[in-house]
């Protein structure tokens, strides 16, 4: 059975971020994606200028009520949330999660708590970080912070892999069953590798791949793709190890393709066959 994922995050008309980055790769792995956009911008904000609007929070709820009205909400296997335009949008998303789980008790909530970036600092509207700490985290089944976001969620510094595992376990005590630390950055074993951790109450998997050097301008949307692909693989029944290995390789293929084409925006269409069947392989290690 093909899995259906309600993906609630940002949308850009030009380029790739949020749903505009993750939607196609998720579909390429064989999932039905229902994109619901928290913002519609001309382009992502790292360009320094953009046009567009943040969707009214009630818009999100209205759209989902429309899906419920045609009796399709029970076919939703998971809700994925990413970039929020406001804390109030977050409250509406949690209402949507409750509504989906009422229609399908097996449905999962994957929260990508987009708040900041090791190089960019905090990048969200006031109140969003507090929303994730107080409400998003306890409501989630799976949560996928980067290092900055992990520190915000656990409310203390994380300096190495061991501390990252302990911090992830602190989050698990508050709600989620799975924590993906999607960029260990300075807390990783090696400064010249891209490292991730996948943590549950009784398992820890670590993986690393080469960093792809884009100089001063790192492509946007890598985390969005990572979260979306991990959710698809887990819904399709992959083990933690299998999911982590496939996602790491698929994202690496996108990065290598983007670099080879000398582009700044993620080249998800050009890399599509290697998203489905990566040519590289990176082995996850159980810690």
Swiss-Prot record:
GO terms for cellular component: cytosol. It holds the Pfam family Phos_pyr_kin. ATP binds at residues 112, 144, 149, 182, 209-212. Its EC number is 2.7.1.35. GO terms for molecular function: ATP binding; magnesium ion binding; pyridoxal kinase activity. It catalyses: pyridoxal + ATP = pyridoxal 5'-phosphate + ADP + H(+). Its cofactor is Mg(2+). This is Pyridoxal kinase PdxY. It comes from Shigella flexneri.
């Amino acid at each position: 059975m093909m899995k259906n994922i309600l993906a609630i995050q940002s949308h850009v008309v030009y380029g790739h971020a949020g749903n505009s980055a993750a939607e196609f790769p998720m579909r390429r792995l064989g999932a039905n994606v229902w994109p619901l956009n928290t913002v519609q911008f001309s382009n992502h904000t790292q360009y320094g200028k953009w046009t567009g609007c943040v969707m009214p929070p009630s818009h999100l709820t209205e759209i989902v009520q429309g899906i419920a009205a045609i009796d399709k909400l029970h076919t939703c296997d998971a809700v994925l949330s990413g970039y929020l335009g406001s804390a109030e949008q977050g409250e509406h998303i949690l209402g949507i999660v409750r509504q989906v789980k009422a229609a399908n008790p097996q449905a999962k909530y994957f929260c990508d708590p987009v708040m900041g970036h090791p190089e960019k600092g905090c990048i969200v509207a006031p109140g969003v970080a507090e929303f994730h700490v107080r409400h998003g985290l306890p409501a989630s089944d799976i949560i996928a912070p980067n290092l900055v976001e992990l520190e915000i969620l656990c409310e203390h510094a994380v300096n190495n892999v061991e501390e990252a595992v302990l911090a992830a376990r602190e989050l698990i005590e508050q709600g989620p069953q799975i924590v993906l630390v999607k960029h260990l950055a300075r807390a990783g074993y090696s400064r010249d590798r891209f490292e991730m951790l996948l943590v549950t109450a009784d398992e820890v998997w670590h993986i690393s791949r080469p960093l792809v050097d884009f100089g001063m301008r790192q492509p946007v949307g890598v985390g969005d793709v990572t979260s979306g692909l991990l959710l698809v693989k887990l819904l399709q029944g992959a083990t933690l190890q299998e999911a982590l290995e496939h996602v790491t390789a698929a994202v690496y293929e996108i990065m290598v393709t983007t670099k080879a084409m000398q582009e700044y925006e993620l080249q998800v269409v050009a890399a599509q066959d290697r998203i489905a069947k990566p040519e590289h392989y990176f082995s996850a290690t159980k810690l």
